[in-house]
UniProtKB/Swiss-Prot annotation:
A single GO cellular-component term on record: mitochondrial matrix
Protein name as annotated: Iron-sulfur cluster assembly factor IBA57 homolog, mitochondrial
Cell location: Mitochondrion matrix
Biased composition (Polar residues): 386-404
Xref: InterPro entries: TrmE/GcvT_dom1 (IPR027266), YgfZ/GcvT (IPR045179), YgfZ/GcvT_CS (IPR017703)
SUPFAM superfamilies: Folate-binding domain (SSF103025)
Family of the protein in this entry: Belongs to the GcvT family. CAF17/IBA57 subfamily.
Gene3D superfamilies (UniProt xref): 2.40.30.160, Probable tRNA modification gtpase trme, domain 1 (3.30.1360.120)
Domain of life: Eukaryota
Coiled-coil residue spans: none
Length: 469
């Protein structure tokens, strides 16, 4: 049994509104993405010709206005920077460079068709989307850093986050096309015009509900992975509408042209989560509470959430130093847990990881508390070193020798990886990159309630969307 190939799901996210004259500067000092137009380099000669093309960004972007967002990719050899009104993926770190939360950041509003959001366009405004489990802690952090900044920070429980995806080649091509047409502008004026055209052309949304769409983003954490949007009304199916006036019927959400070309079923959020796990896309709520993770361990550089030249922000020093050193030792990899049989081992050697909710290992793993997952030992599949026996010493009636013993010596085991999260027979595991390059099949030791231990297999997947080193 797999997750659905297509669907629309509501996400368990909280939305925080950040608005005011200093909103752009305030957020730029907290998130790992660049919001200000200046390029920061310690040495002028390190600015490449490609980067020099954007030296006039400060003339194009007025940060005191609601200009949208900059989009950049640190792995783009042409160093393209686009200005548009769709959202971006980012992270917020603590002072030690550890991840507080990942997030999506949207310009507020996305569009201004028929001047419906004209009042909001008068000053910088953003929607910060985070997992509901972290929202209260994040509010405390934001207020702590506010100081004298002229910003209003308000959680808005009347905003709703949704996710749509379609795992067909047709949708992938469609998504590529609309990005090229509507979200590759080079200045704020064109960015707003393109966003308005996206609504007026009935590309995705039905224009009749345009006043309800506050945020929009193409999820490019994985290229063309899906669409995210924020509405000011909940979306309902025919079954649960019950004549409510304060909802958007799902059949009224999508444009006629989109509905004719693509399926639009509603699904549970669990389908979105399973799809993330299979593709190796980590989110901070996947980890147990209190986990201490670095942004590169979470693959932030691979998911378009990092700017290298934006200047100072909280946690920047360790992050940039790690990148400049060029060595990232550990990353979170997607894995599949399986029963250790010769057939399974042989099959998975040549096949990608895959969701199987009926696999017996699902029950085995469900008996392990989340707090204990990280303590389980992952070792090489052929790790069967014999016990070492010390040479016997001469027996003495008086005392045992302090220099030797016939006692069996067990070599201390060292786990090669740490389980971050488990979903059915899939998981996310922290592993050394060098170990995965050598081997992708491991075994996991589980405690047995019947006494002793049991082992299950672990197949590590290397996502095909990761950049080639």
């Amino acid at each position: 049994m797999r997750f659905p190939n297509v669907g629309l799901a509501e996400l368990s996210k909280s939305i925080i509104k950040i608005r005011g004259p200093d909103a752009t500067k305030f957020l730029n000092g907290l998130v790992t993405s660049r919001l200000l137009p200046n390029v920061v380099k310690k040495k002028q000669h390190t600015i490449s010709e490609s980067e020099n093309r954007h030296s006039n960004l400060s003339e194009i972007i007025d940060v005191s206005k609601n200009y949208g967002l900059m989009h950049e990719d640190i792995y783009d050899p042409d160093y393209n920077i686009n200005i548009s009104r769709d959202g971006i993926n980012s992270m917020i770190l603590n002072s030690k460079g550890r991840v507080v939360t990942d997030c999506f950041l949207y310009p507020d509003p996305f569009h201004n068709v028929d001047w419906v959001f004209q009042e909001s366009m008068n000053e910088p405004g953003y929607l910060l989307e985070v997992d509901t489990s972290i929202s209260q802690q994040l509010m405390m952090i934001l207020k702590l850093h506010k100081l004298s900044a002229k910003v209003d920070i308000v959680p808005d429980k009347k905003l709703y986050s949704y996710y749509y995806y379609d795992d067909t080649a047709t949708f992938d091509a469609w998504l590529e096309n609309i990005q090229f047409k509507y979200f590759k502008s080079l200045d704020p004026t064109t960015a707003l015009q393109n966003a308005n055209s996206f609504i007026k052309d009935n590309v995705f949304f039905n224009q009749q509900i345009a006043k309800n769409i506050l945020g929009f983003a193409v999820d490019n954490r994985i290229p063309n992975f899906g669409i995210k949007f924020i509405s000011n009304k909940p979306i309902s199916t025919n079954n649960d509408n019950d004549g409510q006036q304060d909802v958007i019927p799902v059949e009224s959400l999508f444009s006629e042209s989109f509905s004719q070309e693509f399926d639009t079923p509603t699904i549970n959020e669990s389908g979105v989560v399973q799809r993330r796990f299979q593709n190796g896309l980590f989110e901070i709520q996947d980890a147990s509470k209190g986990s201490s993770l670095l942004p590169f361990e979470c693959n932030l550089d691979y998911t378009n959430g990092l700017s290298l030249d934006k200047g100072c922000y909280v946690g920047q020093e360790l992050t940039i130093r790690t990148f400049n050193n060029g060595v990232i030792r550990k990353r979170i990899f997607p894995v599949q847990f399986f029963q250790l049989t010769e057939y399974n081992i042989s099959y998975l050697q040549d096949h990608p990881i895959d969701l199987n909710m009926s696999d017996p290992v699902v029950e085995n793993l469900s008996n392990i508390p989340n707090s204990s997952l990280g303590k389980l030992e992952i070792t090489p599949l052929d790790d069967s070193e014999p016990q070492q026996q010390q040479p016997p010493t001469n027996e003495s009636p008086f005392a045992s020798s302090p220099f030797g013993s016939s006692k069996v010596v067990r070599k201390r085991k060292t786990s090669l990886g740490k389980i971050v999260s488990v979903k059915d027979n899939l998981g996310l595991v922290m592993l050394a990159v060098s170990d995965v390059e050598k081997c992708q099949i491991y075994k996991l030791e589980l405690p047995s309630f019947e006494g002793g231990t049991q082992f299950i297999g672990v197949k590590v997947g290397i996502p095909d969307w990761w950049p080639v080193n």
